[in-house]
Amino acid sequence: MPHRSRHKKGRSSSVRPPHPTVPTWIQYTPEEVEQLAVELARRGFPPSQIGIILRDQYGIPLVKPITGKKLTKILEEHGIKQELPEDLLNLIRRALRIRKHLEEHPKDMASRRGLQLVESKIHRLIKYYKRVGKIPQDFVYNPEALSHLAT
């Protein structure tokens, strides 16, 4: 499937199984997987990084088939909740980086166009997250107010 706002086609990648089952070679119990995830989150890793660490260092391919819950749900149950979803937060950080670049290089039209594309993705995601209830209905994307997220 082609990418939105790009002239290139999408890239092929490995396909995840349609009905993932718990592999027989996994030696961790669901409680141990939850504890590992919570420990990594307390050390400051976002959910995507936690999944990669569990896959690469602990040999846990997917959390949901083992525990029956998604990783973000596990973290919420243990009191670790993000104020914004991770994908939206990453897009906001990217937009803030581009804005900072444009302050120093105001005639960089390619970056200005990139900022438009990133901010349109942000607005689409905000509409979706408001609809499903992941962010409050009165949330407004304001780059100046969200500048504390740039770190």
Curated annotation (Swiss-Prot):
InterPro entries xrefs: Ribosomal_uS15, Ribosomal_uS15_arc_euk, Ribosomal_uS15_N, uS15_NS1_RNA-bd_sf
GO biological process: translation
Region (Disordered): 1-24
Pfam family, one: Ribosomal_S15
A GO term, aspect molecular function: small ribosomal subunit rRNA binding
Compositionally biased residues, Basic residues: 1-11
Keywords: Ribonucleoprotein, Ribosomal protein
GO CC terms: cytosolic small ribosomal subunit
Highest taxon above the source species: Archaea
Record NCBIfam families: PRK08561.1 (NF006331)
Family: Belongs to the universal ribosomal protein uS15 family.
UniProt subunit comment: Part of the 30S ribosomal subunit.
Name of the protein in its database record: Small ribosomal subunit protein uS15
Species of the source: Pyrobaculum calidifontis (strain DSM 21063 / JCM 11548 / VA1)
Lineage: Archaea, Thermoproteota, Thermoprotei, Thermoproteales, Thermoproteaceae
